[in-house]
């Protein structure tokens, strides 16, 4: 059987890593050993931050809903509780979008929440 040298595979692997490290500062974009570490760490950060992004958006939606709710004389928790009691099933993403883009509709929802809290 013929001897196989791994030069082609090594070159391909090096090119792949250095391509991923393009735009990094200094040795991180030029030296293979350093680039491997940088690309690996970048992947770890990317994986972690895809999870964090979901949490951050939920926090942003809650802040926006709370601000709009307080303009209508309710706190965030009382608004959400009132909507649940009124059987209005609307998620925080959509509710925050309504609060920002359509205050009249949000006010109507807040009134329904208030009514269901008193009833």
Curated annotation (Swiss-Prot):
Q: Which Pfam families match?
A: Ribosomal_L20
Tell me a Gene Ontology molecular-function term this record carries: rRNA binding
InterPro entries registered for this protein in UniProt: Ribosomal_bL20, RIBOSOMAL_L20_CS, Ribosomal_protein_bL20_C
Q: Does the keyword Chloroplast apply?
A: no
Q: Which GO cellular component does the record give, naming just one?
A: ribonucleoprotein complex
Q: Which domain of life is it from?
A: Bacteria
Has keyword Glycoprotein? Answer: no
Keywords (alphabetical) are: Ribonucleoprotein, Ribosomal protein, RNA-binding, rRNA-binding
Please list the GO biological process terms of this entry: ribosomal large subunit assembly; translation
Q: Which PANTHER family match?
A: 39S RIBOSOMAL PROTEIN L20 (PTHR10986)
Q: What is the official name of this protein in its record? A: Large ribosomal subunit protein bL20
What's the source species for this entry?
Answer: Alcanivorax borkumensis (strain ATCC 700651 / DSM 11573 / NCIMB 13689 / SK2)
């Amino acid at each position: 059987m013929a001897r196989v040298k791994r030069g082609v595979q090594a070159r391909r692997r090096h090119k792949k890593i250095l391509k991923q490290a393009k735009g990094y500062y200094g040795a991180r974009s030029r030296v293979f050993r350093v680039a491997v570490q940088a690309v690996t760490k970048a992947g770890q950060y990317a994986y972690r931050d895809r999870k964090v992004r979901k949490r951050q958006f939920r926090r942003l939606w809650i802040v926006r809903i709370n601000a709009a709710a307080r303009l209508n004389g309710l706190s965030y928790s009382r608004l959400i509780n009132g909507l649940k009691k009124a059987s209005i099933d609307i998620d925080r993403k959509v509710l925050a979008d309504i609060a920002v883009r359509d205050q009249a509709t949000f006010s109507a929802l807040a009134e329904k929440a208030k009514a269901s809290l008193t009833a």
